[in-house]
Amino acid sequence: MDFHGTTILGVKRNGKTVICGDGQVTMGETIFKGNAKKVRRLGEGKVISGFAGSVADALALYERFEGKYKSSHGNLMKAAVELTKEWRMDKALRRLEALLLVADKENIFLISGNGEVMEPQEDAIAIGSGGPYAYAAAMALLRNTDLDAEEIAQKAIKIAGEICIYTNDNITMEIIE
């Protein structure tokens, strides 16, 4: 049975960085769980993150990312690059199916097993099945309102949940200021 769907969104505005996610886990055509937590703090609370994909794979990657973050003395970009290199080169890790968003006060990165570490051009980035909807909503709100990052993230996930059947509005959020 396949587990599907998630929406994870990162937003930066006015010195505040937010990563939030919905709570829905879908198995086949059934909502399996509505209050899953796909967002967490890492690096002694200095990094916020969210994942899309396999939970077990994401947890394994979080553990490795924390090690890279510590060994890079809190350099988020270096930790992201080092994790990606290891992910690509290790035969067991290569099979892991997850995407990670990681952020600190200044940066948000998307980390993938394809060897990418991407920093968004804009002040928003999203992953998962509802990601395109949340991203579009966040960009519209960033460009046309004075809402703060937290409000933008909440509204964007809520909009994604109204469009994507694999996304709900049970939001988990982590904030760094």
Curated annotation (Swiss-Prot):
Under InterPro entries, the record lists: ATP-dep_Prtase_HsIV_su, Ntn_hydrolases_N, Proteasome_sua/b, Proteasome_suB-type
Tell me which Gene Ontology terms the entry assigns under biological process: proteolysis involved in protein catabolic process
Main subcellular location of this protein, as a coarse class: cytoplasm
Enzyme Commission number, as recorded = 3.4.25.2
Per the entry, what this protein does is: Protease subunit of a proteasome-like degradation complex believed to be a general protein degrading machinery.
Pfam families (alphabetical): Proteasome
If you read the UniProt record, what top EC class would you report for this enzyme, in one word?
hydrolase
Q: List the Gene Ontology MF annotations in alphabetical order.
A: metal ion binding; threonine-type endopeptidase activity
Q: Relate the assembly described in the record.
A: A double ring-shaped homohexamer of HslV is capped on each side by a ring-shaped HslU homohexamer. The assembly of the HslU/HslV complex is dependent on binding of ATP.
Q: Which HAMAP family match?
A: HslV (MF_00248)
Q: What is the recorded name of this protein?
A: ATP-dependent protease subunit HslV
GO CC, sorted alphabetically, is: HslUV protease complex; proteasome core complex
Write down the NCBIfam families for this protein, in alphabetical order: ATP_dep_HslV, PRK05456.1
Q: Where in the cell is it found?
A: Cytoplasm
Activity regulation text: Allosterically activated by HslU binding.
Q: Which residues bind Na(+)?
A: 161, 164, 167
Sorted alphabetically, the keyword list is: Allosteric enzyme, Cytoplasm, Hydrolase, Metal-binding, Protease, Sodium, Threonine protease
Catalytically driven reaction(s): ATP-dependent cleavage of peptide bonds with broad specificity
Q: Where is the active site?
A: 6
Q: Does the keyword Plastid apply?
A: no
Q: Which family does it belong to?
A: Belongs to the peptidase T1B family. HslV subfamily.
Q: Which Gene3D superfamilies match?
A: Glutamine Phosphoribosylpyrophosphate, subunit 1, domain 1 (3.60.20.10)
